[in-house]
Amino acid sequence: MPRRALAEKRPLLLASIAAALAFYYLRWGPWPELYLIPIKGAAVGLLALYLWQRHSSPDARLLAWAFGAASLGDMALEIETDRLIGGLLFFAYHVMAMGVYLRNRRPRLARSQKTAVVTMLLLTPAIAWFLPADRAEAANIGIYALALGAMAASAWASVFPR
């Protein structure tokens, strides 16, 4: 069987890579930022579409939805000034990704792995809460970091390779 090029075999994957590279190179050019927002969202959005088309398992579908939320969150963070909508979309991404990881838990965790899980879960929001200079934002950032820490902890406790 002949080896086909990535462009023939997985064009959405190649387009996703191209969009990611294009965004980071074009943002230093003379183009208005408004034109770059869809390119930024396309990098992860095309991964979501690729995943949806190539895999039909419930985990893959949930991960595709998660990538879709992350793509919209990326674009919302570029558009919005208060970052609420982007933050909520990324919060949703973390919760959906956590769902994939929790459905694929390791049957047993060693004591060191349990310690790592608890550390990620607790320290991520605690550190994030102390970081903002604007203390009015500390609670929102801490809540977001709780979802981030929970996702990282559930990924660590999953059967997926580290």
Sequence positions of predicted segments:
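Polytopic alpha-helical membrane-helix bundles and their juxtamembrane interface segments
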Residues: M1-R162
